[in-house]
Curated annotation (Swiss-Prot):
Disulfide bonds: none annotated. It is a multi-pass membrane protein. Its main location: plastid. The chain crosses the membrane at residues 9-29, 40-60, 89-109, 125-145, 147-167, 185-205, 221-241, 258-278, 280-300, 327-347, 354-374, 396-416, 425-445, 547-567, 608-628, 723-743. It comes from Barbarea verna. NCBIfam families: NDH_I_L (TIGR01974), PRK06590.1 (NF005141). The gene is ndhF. This is NAD(P)H-quinone oxidoreductase subunit 5, chloroplastic. NDH shuttles electrons from NAD(P)H:plastoquinone, via FMN and iron-sulfur (Fe-S) centers, to quinones in the photosynthetic chain and possibly in a chloroplast respiratory chain. The immediate electron acceptor for the enzyme in this species is believed to be plastoquinone. Couples the redox reaction to proton translocation, and thus conserves the redox energy in a proton gradient.
Length: 746
């Protein structure tokens, strides 16, 4: 066992050779590196699988022995200061390592097909490998300096992947927005780390916690300053985990490739903030005001994320706000001291949300055959509908993920969310009411996404025949740059069409190639009753096996991962594996833990939350069930208008909620007006002051000296008599002025 821990330091570095070799290969041997690109994918998956096996073994050992292992090396810089670095293996490290590697492997397999036609394929896998390395380094760090180093690397990889298609202005802006927003959090985290070191003199977690607790117990430190340092530490996770008010970057991060959205939202960047709060919880828990702030930020984020998801039309943005809300649940649980519940929900949500994002990627992939390679269209749920019969496997996987996030038993998120709701009732009735209400909203907006996407009829062609003038068609090149394409009107909106029944137009290549008999025999539909020209339409198809396989594995995780934390005992049998794993931490932190004694108590506590979820699903079904006659019924507002045309006040309320949600709560607009515009005005004022005042004075002195010199030169004419005349004139003027001043005094 000790021998195993001795080599645990290598965990973060196992995936690192792939990005290094890819970088060197693309610089020195670009052709050979590109020709072997599938080999790099296999190597990435293989190395990450080794880390997964290692993490599983460590977790099993910790369940058996309930131990924490730390190994530190010291680097002495001088006699007064030495830097210590090492690795820290505890249950939190093990569970996070398993989460990162399992989701990471499945996303890599998925990406091999999803990104196969992209020119940045190798660059993508290099970033992914470095991303996994950074996150593994973060969770195994033994001190705050290492945490901050890998924290920044995780952020850097996220920015690179969010702006992966950097030639698209909207993706570049999203990358910049994520960078600037997280700078605020990272600066706060750095100040908090420095403040804690100034107080305790240590960066090591175990030493830091012990010294910190002793200082508070003995009242040997300014408590206000201590609270400020703890709050600054928390500012970092606020930004990284998209908590209010630094959440604004998360929806825009959907401009990156869909596999990255799955990884960021499930197991890497946003999970990093939750991990850090969990790691530092022994420090936060001794400051009640900080714990209350954490729970308050969490409950605000829970409600805000749910309300902002209500009216989103982009499927990925809807899931992004869902992630924001679920992260709020985790932060709420940590603020209440419910350590186990928070991490349990982190695990269950990670697999469910990864399944949903990979499912959305499969949907987007199939929609691109209809609307072209344009995110504004392929991700727009208003253009979807009726996909059940076209992508049945994707539909099943997406439905399971949706039900899990809604909190329907026995799926994964039911077990963890129910614990958080019960703990919130013990913590604060107001928080419990908000948390339970948001559970209903979660079920509502998740089923809204499902119904708009899979139920009814495919709406793409009907919108084009709605009588409205269609906007110009845009496609995206392999690097993501928007380019306007002129379409032959006989082709409609189908970029993948048959040509003479023997050739097919490919989006990714200019050349044409023969299509197979299977494709030639596929069902097409001809619409003749719109008073327009007869057109042939192409319908979505199920994705390839390499896209479906990770989804099916995640589906199994979503079905069964909740079993590790079943919170009740029956006839002496303890089903709660998660509590056994977290035993050392729970003994210190989890004050609200109350294991359910039997089935009756468990059912009594679960019935209420499940009832709320089913109520949200019922409302969503009533409002968004398919209305084939008009696409206008697909919006929340118009559905209420159909049912409540005479209730003007109710319509105004619904209209307000819809506008609030669709416009992101006007928070982005507020930041733009109050911060961005103010900074721009300040920059313009500074520019004016610098150019007109500072430069004006400097240039004015220079110009004045120049003109005086020129005048003197021309008056003097280089003759001694002229110089004497000027000299005597100056003396006379000086004496005259002196004479007048002298006589004025008398």
């Amino acid at each position: 066992m000790e021998h195993t821990y001795q080599y645990s330091w290598i965990i973060p570095f196992i995936p690192l050779p792939v990005p290094i070799l890819l970088g060197v290969g693309l610089l020195l041997f670009p052709t050979a590196t590109k020709n072997l690109r599938r080999m790099w994918t296999f190597l990435s998956i293989f190395l990450l699988s080794i880390v997964m096996i290692f993490a599983l073994y460590l977790s099993i050992q910790q369940i058996i022995l309930s131990c924490i292992h730390q190994n530190v090396w010291s680097w002495t810089i001088n006699n007064e200061f030495s830097f210590e670095f090492g690795y820290f293996i505890d249950p939190l490290t093990s569970i996070m390592s398993i989460l990162i590697t399992t989701v990471g492997i499945l996303v890599l397999i998925y990406s091999d097909n999803y990104m196969s036609h992209d020119q940045g394929y190798l660059r993508f896998f290099a970033y992914m490998g470095f991303f996994n390395t950074s996150m593994l380094g973060l969770v195994t760090s033994s001190n705050l300096i290492q945490v901050y180093f890998f924290w920044e690397l995780v952020g850097m990889c996220s920015y690179l992947l969010i702006g992966f298609w950097f030639t698209r202005p909207i993706a570049a802006n999203a990358c910049q927005k994520a960078f600037v927003t997280n700078r605020v959090g990272d600066f706060g985290l750095l100040l908090g780390i420095l403040g804690l070191y100034w107080i305790t003199g240590s960066f090591e977690f175990q030493d830091l916690f012990e010294i910190f607790n002793n200082l508070i117990l003995n009242n040997r430190v300014n408590f206000l300053f201590l609270t400020l340092c703890a709050f600054l530490l928390f500012v970092g996770p606020i930004a990284k985990s998209a908590q209010f008010p630094l959440h604004v970057w998360l929806p825009d991060a959907m401009e990156g490739p869909t596999p990255i959205s799955a990884l960021i939202h499930a197991a890497t960047m946003v999970a990093a903030g939750i991990f850090l709060v969990a790691r530092l919880l022994p420090l936060f828990i001794v400051i009640p005001s900080i714990m209350y702030i954490i729970s308050l930020i969490g409950i605000i984020t829970v409600l805000l994320g749910a309300t902002l998801a209500l009216a989103q039309k982009d499927i990925k943005r809807g899931l992004a706000y869902s992630t924001m809300s679920q992260l709020g649940y985790m932060m709420l649980a940590l603020g209440m001291g419910s350590y186990r519940s928070a991490l349990f929900h982190l695990i269950t949500h990670a697999y469910s949300k990864a399944l949903l994002f990979l499912g959305s990627g499969s949907i987007i992939h199939s929609m691109e055959a209809i609307v072209g390679y344009s995110p504004d269209k392929s991700q727009n749920m208003i253009l979807m509908g009726g996909l059940t019969k076209h992508v049945p496997i994707t539909k099943t996987a997406f439905l399971v993920g949706t039900l899990s996030l809604c909190g329907i038993p026995p799926l994964a998120c039911f077990w963890s969310k129910d614990e958080i709701l019960n703990d919130s009732l013990l913590f604060s009735p107001i928080f419990a009411i908000i948390a339970c209400s948001t559970a209903g909203l979660t079920a509502f907006y998740m089923f809204r996404i499902y119904l708009l996407t899979f139920e009814g009829h495919l709406n793409t062609y009907f919108i084009n025949y709605s009588g409205k003038k269609s906007s110009s068609f845009y496609s995206i090149s392999l690097w993501g740059k928007e380019e306007e394409k002129k379409l032959n009107r006989n082709f409609g909106l189908v970029p993948l069409l048959t040509m003479n029944n023997t050739k097919r137009a490919s989006f990714f290549y200019k050349k044409t190639y023969k299509i197979s008999n299977n494709v030639r025999n596929q069902t097409f539909i001809t619409v003749e009753n719109f008073g327009l020209n007869t057109r042939t339409f192409y319908y979505p198809q199920e994705s390839d096996n390499t896209i479906l396989f990770p989804m099916l594995v995640l589906l199994l995780f979503t079905l069964f991962i909740g079993a590790i934390g079943i919170p009740f005992n029956q006839e002496g049998i303890d089903f709660d594996i998660l509590s056994k794993l977290f035993t050392p931490s729970i003994n210190l932190l989890h004050k609200n833990s109350q294991s359910f004694v039997d089935w009756y108590e468990f059912l009594r506590n679960a019935t209420f939350s499940v009832s709320i979820a089913f109520f949200g699903i019922f409302i969503a079904y009533c409002l968004y069930k398919p209305f084939y006659s008009s696409l206008l019924n697909l919006t929340l507002l118009n559905s209420f208008q159909k049912w409540n045309s005479k209730r003007i006040r109710w319509e105004k309320l619904i209209n307000f909620v819809y506008n609030w949600s669709y416009n992101r709560g006007y928070i982005d607009a507020f930041f733009k007006t109050s911060l961005i515009e103010s900074i721009r005005r300040l920059a313009k004022l500074t520019n004016f002051f610098d150019k007109r005042i500072i430069d004006g004075i400097t240039n004015g002195v220079g110009i004045t000296s120049f003109f005086v010199g020129e005048v003197t030169k021309y008056i003097g004419g280089s003759r001694v008599s002229s110089y004497l005349f000027l000299y005597l004139s100056y003396v006379l003027i000086f004496l005259t002025i002196l004479f007048f001043f002298y006589f004025e005094k008398f």
